[in-house]
């Protein structure tokens, strides 16, 4: 899985320069081998070997160049059918040294097993693939050169079925990424040379039949993890108590003897995770014996603790203090050491740290203005930051020349991804000479009925030019100074998705921050300055009147790959539909679209507009009381041949949803092996059971809403 939202899949629509050359009368084969190899590197491996290679002698030779076949990436190659993968392995398997089949959930174990033919493999990523213990054993027994492995551990896994040859291979593995769907050590005890361990805990508290699972493992001398050479430990937990129980068993061994070479220790836990005696011993040992360059801890381990001031860091590149009650004073004193040079820091996650830009957390209210001197110190010390997350907090700037949050962040010229709360980009506190905007939800009930926005002038034409960004806007200036930004998130500080993980759908959300009322179409239009933008999230912008700024983005952000829009404008009416339809005409490279909006009508007009996105692969719609037209969905899927994921959660009846889902699968499954369709009522009590069957790659990347900037360290996994 790509970290921090990075897109590492093959990009065959980047071959346009060659097409342009041919239009000028230059034949493709007239280019040098070096240029041709660069062009061919953007062609999916299956297409390269099974099709392009057979066109002529020159391409036949180039397609077998080591630079193209030593590393094969099949993740997100949704056209990679069973036959294609088997044929690919048969033809170049012996040459492949690095193979990623991450998220290839549609391939059966019998096909994945063919990886055993790639005997030169050094790295292989099989996360999301179906493999039994016996098949894994057979495959690993043949891969004697393997040093990096990523697998899933599913119910039924039995380490006793692993052969001695398999265990010999595992003993040489230095990097392991293991996604756990059942309480287990997996293959960790067999990996006696581990230097990097990544653990993803996705264990559900109950079985499908409702039985409560136990997190206890059979712990014996033979199945204790070996951590003596460990340099990187990373654990990410999905919600649920059982994931916390199991991770404690992994941590218990670390607390007995902390590896001296440990330099990255990261635990990502939603909610609270109580500190135990063993974890306290581990942290004390780390403070005494190790020097870290990456750190993330559960908020309950840091809140009220002096731990940070005892930790030792050397050229740190990643910090995450997400949801911690870290004050700005502590941030400066304990992390930045009063302004110490932290030019090495590449990624910083302060999401949900509501007091991190204020000197003291005890006397501050959430809506109080920030202390700009703290942010100024942070910016000066961490001048090479590439990824910064300040979402899920109220970071309000006071009046003051050059002291606005946007003006200070504009100094971070190396930023490539940025996540901000909507209220933080408002120009300033409302002035006496400016009529205040009417809050979108304050004057209306918060039940299921449609909300009527009062005190707002009638909407102008979406294309009247009123969304042109104002050069005097601090947000406009910020984006002007960050022209190479690739990932931008503007998320309302009070926003919560209607579809959380492992819980019923949320029926109501908190009203937006009052400062967010002055952020609307003009600010959205300013995003059009970002010519290199690839990923965009806009959530809870109540003052979007027409969505005309979206057209600006569609016209100018031609690199846009993923778009997530949630709760824009008035909650009782989708006011931006005409603008969105016009925007989509220009999104030729858009692959992922997620829309979350109450009362959204997924009608023929919407799907007709969506059909103009030729690269679209994944669609997710979440709409309380929303409607859809089954015929329009079927026609859209017939026109858009690249779409392999269609998730629609609306207010339609269960019968309507089931009928449409069956029709889609019956019509398109045979031609699209990776097709994943979920059509289900958003507020139905069975939603949790439906979600558990969604492939993790889709669930994690698009179906569930979350901030993805600085979510993980850069380049955590290849």
Curated annotation (Swiss-Prot):
Which InterPro entries has this protein been placed in?
F-box-like_dom_sf, F-box_dom, FBXL18_F-box, FBXL18_LRR, LRR_dom_sf
- Tell me the Gene Ontology biological-process terms attached to this UniProt entry: SCF-dependent proteasomal ubiquitin-dependent protein catabolic process
Keywords (A to Z) from UniProt: Leucine-rich repeat, Repeat, Ubl conjugation pathway
The record, for CDD domains, names:
F-box_FBXL18
GO CC annotations on file = cytosol
| RNA-binding in keyword set | no
Q: Which residues form the F-box domain?
A: 25-72
LRR repeats sit at 77-103, 104-128, 129-153, 177-201, 324-352, 367-392, 393-422, 468-492, 516-540, 542-567, 572-597, 599-623
Keyword Repeat included in the entry's annotation: yes
Looking up PANTHER family in the UniProt record yields: F-BOX AND LEUCINE-RICH REPEAT PROTEIN 18, F-BOX/TPR REPEAT PROTEIN POF3
Assembly, per entry: Directly interacts with SKP1 and CUL1.
Q: What does this protein do?
A: Substrate-recognition component of the SCF (SKP1-CUL1-F-box protein)-type E3 ubiquitin ligase complex.
Q: What is this protein called?
A: F-box/LRR-repeat protein 18
Q: Which gene encodes it?
A: FBXL18
């Amino acid at each position: 899985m790509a970290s921090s939202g990075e897109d590492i899949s093959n990009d065959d629509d980047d071959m346009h320069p060659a097409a342009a050359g041919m239009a000028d009368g230059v034949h493709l084969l007239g280019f040098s081998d070096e240029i041709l190899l660069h062009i061919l590197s953007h062609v999916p491996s299956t297409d390269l070997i099974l099709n392009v290679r057979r066109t002529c002698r020159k391409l036949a030779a180039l397609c077998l160049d080591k630079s193209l076949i030593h590393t094969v990436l099949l993740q997100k190659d949704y056209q990679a059918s069973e036959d294609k993968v088997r044929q690919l392995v048969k033809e170049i398997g012996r040459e492949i040294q690095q193979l990623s089949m991450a998220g290839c959930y549609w391939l059966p174990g019998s096909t994945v097993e063919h990886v055993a033919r790639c005997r030169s493999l050094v790295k292989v990523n099989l996360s999301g693939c179906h493999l039994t213990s016996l098949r894994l054993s057979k495959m690993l027994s043949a891969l004697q050169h393997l040093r990096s492995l990523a697998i899933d551990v599913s119910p039924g896994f039995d380490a006793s079925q692993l052969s001695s040859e398999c265990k010999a291979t595992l003993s040489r593995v230095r990097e392991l990424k293991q996604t756990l769907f059942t309480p287990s050590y997996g293959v960790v005890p067999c990996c006696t040379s581990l230097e990097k361990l990544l653990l993803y805990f996705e264990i559900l508290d109950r079985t499908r039949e409702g039985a409560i699972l136990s997190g206890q493992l059979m712990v014996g001398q033979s199945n204790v993890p070996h951590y003596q050479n460990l340099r990187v430990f990373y654990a990410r937990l999905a919600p649920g108590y059982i994931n916390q129980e199991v991770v404690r068993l992994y941590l218990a061994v670390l607390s007995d003897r902390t590896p001296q070479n440990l330099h990255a220790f990261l635990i990502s836990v939603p909610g609270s995770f109580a500190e135990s005696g063993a974890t306290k011993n581990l942290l004390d040992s780390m403070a005494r014996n190790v020097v870290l360059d990456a750190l993330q801890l559960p908020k309950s381990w840091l809140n009220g603790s002096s731990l940070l001031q005892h930790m030792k860091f050397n050229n740190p590149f990643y910090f995450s203090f997400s949801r911690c009650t870290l004050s700005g004073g502590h941030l400066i004193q304990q992390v930045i050491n009063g302004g110490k040079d932290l030019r090495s820091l590449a990624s910083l996650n302060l999401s949900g740290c509501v007091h991190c830009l204020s000197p003291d957390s005890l006397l501050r209210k959430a809506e109080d203005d920030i202390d700009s001197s703290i942010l100024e110190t942070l910016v000066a010390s961490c001048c090479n930051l590439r990824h910064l997350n300040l979402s899920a907090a109220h970071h309000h700037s006071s009046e003051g020349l050059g002291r606005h949050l946007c003006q200070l962040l504009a100094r971070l010229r190396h930023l490539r991804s940025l996540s901000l709360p909507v209220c933080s980009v408002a120009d300033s506190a409302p002035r006496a000479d400016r009529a205040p905007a009417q809050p979108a939800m304050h004057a209306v009930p918060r039940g299921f009925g449609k909300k009527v926005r009062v005190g707002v002038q009638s909407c102008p034409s979406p294309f009247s030019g009123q969304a042109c960004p104002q050069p005097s806007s601090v947000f406009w200036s910020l984006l002007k100074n960050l022209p190479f930004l690739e990932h931008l998130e503007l998320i309302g500080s009070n926003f919560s998705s209607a579809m959380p993980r492992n819980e019923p759908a949320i029926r109501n959300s908190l009203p937006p921050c009052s400062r967010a009322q002055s952020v609307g179409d003009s600010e959205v239009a300013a995003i059009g300055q970002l010519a290199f933008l690839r990923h965009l999230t806009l959530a809870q912008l109540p003052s979007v009147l027409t969505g005309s700024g979206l057209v600006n983005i569609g016209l100018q952000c031609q690199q846009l790959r993923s778009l997530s829009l949630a709760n824009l404008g008035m909650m009782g009416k989708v006011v931006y539909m005409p603008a969105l339809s016009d925007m989509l005409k220009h999104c030729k490279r858009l692959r992922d679209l997620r829309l979350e909006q109450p009362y959204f009508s997924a009608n023929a007009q919407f799907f007709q507009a969506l059909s103009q996105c030729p690269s679209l692969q994944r669609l997710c719609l979440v709409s309380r009381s929303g409607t859809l037209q089954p015929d329009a969905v079927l026609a859209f899927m017939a026109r858009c041949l690249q779409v392999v994921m269609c998730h629609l959660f609306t207010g339609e009846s269960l019968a309507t949803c089931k009928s449409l889902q069956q029709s889609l699968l019956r019509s398109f499954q045979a031609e699209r092996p990776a097709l994943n369709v979920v059509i289900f009522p958003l507020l139905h009590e069975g939603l949790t059971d439906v979600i558990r069957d969604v492939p993790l790659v889709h669930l994690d990347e698009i179906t569930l809403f979350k901030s993805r900037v600085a979510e993980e360290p850069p380049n955590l996994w290849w």
